[in-house]
């Protein structure tokens, strides 16, 4: 058995995290799921929600207990092969770097547009914007447990 996972989180723009971890929890399309050492190989899609990396050591993005890093993510894919977890995400943002005022403004803007009435084809876009903003706020305010809330 391996002692740890190696986690690599990348977006189209950058590598957001690379390092050892005890586990990764992702907001799966059909519900959250967790990957730990010696997990079977898999590829899974995930959606808007918190992405939690359970770290083995202090990290600049770690929460106050230095045992996990919480990212707000807007979806992507996660691959597990031989204790290596690769997360290919549309966006990820560590909780410590989320601009709360900007997220609140984005949520209000999306809610206002939905209340004003939009064409059906625009509704999904505004609902997704609202959901992304709400996720960013939850992550920034620490309203995320070890299990997806």
UniProtKB/Swiss-Prot annotation:
Topology of the protein relative to the lipid bilayer: Peripheral membrane protein
Basic and acidic residues: compositionally biased ranges: 99-116, 123-134
Alphabetical keyword list: ATP synthesis, Cell inner membrane, Cell membrane, CF(1), Hydrogen ion transport, Ion transport, Membrane, Transport
CDD domains linked: F1-ATPase_delta (cd12152)
A GO MF term: ATP binding
Broad class of the protein's primary localization: membrane
Places the protein is found: Cell inner membrane
Region (Disordered): 99-149
Coiled coil feature spans: none
GO CC entries: plasma membrane; proton-transporting ATP synthase complex
Membership in a protein family: Belongs to the ATPase epsilon chain family.
NCBIfam families: ATP_synt_epsi (TIGR01216)
Stored PANTHER family: ATP SYNTHASE DELTA/EPSILON CHAIN (PTHR13822), ATP SYNTHASE EPSILON CHAIN, CHLOROPLASTIC (PTHR13822:SF10)
Quaternary organization: F-type ATPases have 2 components, CF(1) - the catalytic core - and CF(0) - the membrane proton channel. CF(1) has five subunits: alpha(3), beta(3), gamma(1), delta(1), epsilon(1). CF(0) has three main subunits: a, b and c.
Function: Produces ATP from ADP in the presence of a proton gradient across the membrane.
HAMAP family per UniProt: ATP_synth_epsil_bac (MF_00530)
Name of the molecule in the record: ATP synthase epsilon chain
Organism of this sequence: Salinibacter ruber (strain DSM 13855 / M31)
